């Protein structure tokens, strides 16, 4: 279906998506923002990233999608938080869709590999978290051997009530491989 790939705003595509959602029995829908978004960037790249994320949020709202997941990007955590909140304002989002910041594997200047950093990003904001198990494993959280320990660490840092989506996937790399 076109709308799932290109997120067209045409009334026919929106109606087709909504019909598909209804046929699914009301399961929550989650979309992933563009992988090119870098909310930690500076200057023009940051502005373009915020605008792209705002556009994704607007499309998600039009479609009735509950969650939009975004990678925080590389750079300063303060810029990530500022960019995410600005995108929500630009899109006019009040409650839905909920913007979820996905944890990362880390490496370089990537933001969001540590649960404590995610906790800071979402504190005192409407932002929430999407846990990606592959990224967590690559960042050093042993989801394969001690998954309950990882969930406990996430709960202590962020609070599981702020983690409505888990992206369960495998990793070809080793524990902590980034």
Predicted regions and their residues:
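Non-cysteine beta-strand/loop elements that form the S-adenosyl-L-methionine
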Residues: 1, 27-31, 127-133, 160-172
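N-terminal pre-domain/capping segments
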Residues: 1-33, 39-55
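Active-site beta-loop-alpha junctions enriched in small/polar residues
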Residues: 1-2, 34-36, 73-75, 102-106, ...
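Acidic-enriched, low-complexity/disordered segments with a strong bias for Aspartate over Glutamate
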Residues: 2, 55-56, 124, 132, ...
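Active-site acidic/histidine proton-transfer and metal-coordination neighborhood
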Residues: 38-131
């Amino acid at each position: 279906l076109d709308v799932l790939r290109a997120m067209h705003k045409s009334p026919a595509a929106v109606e087709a998506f909504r019909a598909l959602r209804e046929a699914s029995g009301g399961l929550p829908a989650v979309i992933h923002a563009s992988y090119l978004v870098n909310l930690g960037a500076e200057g023009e790249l940051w502005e373009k990233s915020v605008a792209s994320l705002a556009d994704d949020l607007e499309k998600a709202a039009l479609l009735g999608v509950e969650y939009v997941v975004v990678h925080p990007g590389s750079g300063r955590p303060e810029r990530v938080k500022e960019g995410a909140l600005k995108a929500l304002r630009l899109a006019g989002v009040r409650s839905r869709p909920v913007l979820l910041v996905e944890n990362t594997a880390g490496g370089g200047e990537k933001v969001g590999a540590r649960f404590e950093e995610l906790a800071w990003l979402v504190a005192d904001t409407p932002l929430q978290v999407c846990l990606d198990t592959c990224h967590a494993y690559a960042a050093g959280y042993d989801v394969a051997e001690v998954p309950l320990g990882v969930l406990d660490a996430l709960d202590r840092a962020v609070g599981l009530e702020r983690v409505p989506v888990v992206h369960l996937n495998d990793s070809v790399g080793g524990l902590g491989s980034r």
